[in-house]
Amino acid sequence: MIAAANTVADRVHEVERSFTVGKAFGVTGKPGPLRVFPDAAKVAELRQRIDAGPFVAVHISARRPAQRWPLERYAQQIGQLSAERKVMLLWAPGARDNPRHPGDDKVAAEIVRTVKGAAVVPVETPDLKTLIAALSLAERVICPDGGAMHLAAALGKPVVALFGDSPIERWRPWGVPHRVLRPESRNLADLPLEPVVAACGELMHPGEAQYHR
């Protein structure tokens, strides 16, 4: 499922590239894990609004078409996941045709309608504070390559990352157990359900998960 990176530069992770800036200030060694800290008040607010966990978070939004997994497969995946854990459905609110920041209100609503009766908690994320707080409540995160994926890694969450046309070695989750999936076409429309379900199962127990390098 995983294709080779396009260029030599793309084989170096962005964290490692950024870390080299510190050499000018005497910073040496290897970069550690990313860290971001959720707002305690926002976390408490979310805990009051949603059911008790544990949760698997599924974030569905992506800017580029090649990074969007089809609605039907998200719904199938969520239906299967909800048999073992409650699923927190996350998305960027707004309209898909917004040229500046495509949103997924309609897609999220259709997924909720399709999986009616499953243990799904929809949580729209209108800002970074809400997104970070919601991700912090999850045991595992399934999402396309993008900002939510990197925030999940910075929160120390095991991640199943769905990659389309971006370089894996440069942008994969950093410093956490993860699985990366990408079809040969580099378009998530061609990624079947089965390998995603299998990857989620592999990360069921974070202590047993392996890093993909």
Model-derived features: positions:
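Catalytic machinery of carbohydrate-active enzymes
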Residues: M1-R213
